[in-house]
Amino acid sequence: RDPNGVRTAMKGCDIVFHLAALIAIPYSYHSPDSYIDTNVKGTLNIVQAAKDLKLERVIVTSTSEVYGTAQYVPIDELHSRQPQSPYSASKIGADCIAESFYTSFDLPLTIVRPFNTFGPRQSARAIIPTIITQLLNGVEEIKLGDLKPTRDFLFVKDTVKGFIEIAKSSSL
């Protein structure tokens, strides 16, 4: 929300990992404007500063939510993007802004779309903490909602390793 603050913070950097975002899907239905301001405009601030400062690379964190309901598995980068919430729409918008800077200005960037990262300090609303909480509360039958979707889970340390490898890679 503060392009000058972003630019100042990025001065002297070679690589920027753009991780900032509002991520709680349910809240996006109540305050979509906040998601647009943070996720889309925030990404614009990052890529604009990266272009102006001639950074070596920007790694933009997106989300698997941009794909919506899987049309096929495994999902790959060719899968259509389907906004199913204001959150996912804001992340698609952020991806499009980033892609436009890559195409228009040759800004070296990579968009990463982690799937269901889990680990320490994770939100209690996520699936794994939900299961653990129910078990610790001694419930006899765990309640999860729709059991049909299949999900991949990625431990947070593995996500970090992936980001580091992407930063070290010469490929965009």
Each language-model region and where it sits:
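Alpha-helical substrate-binding/gating segment
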Residues: 103, 129-141, 153-172
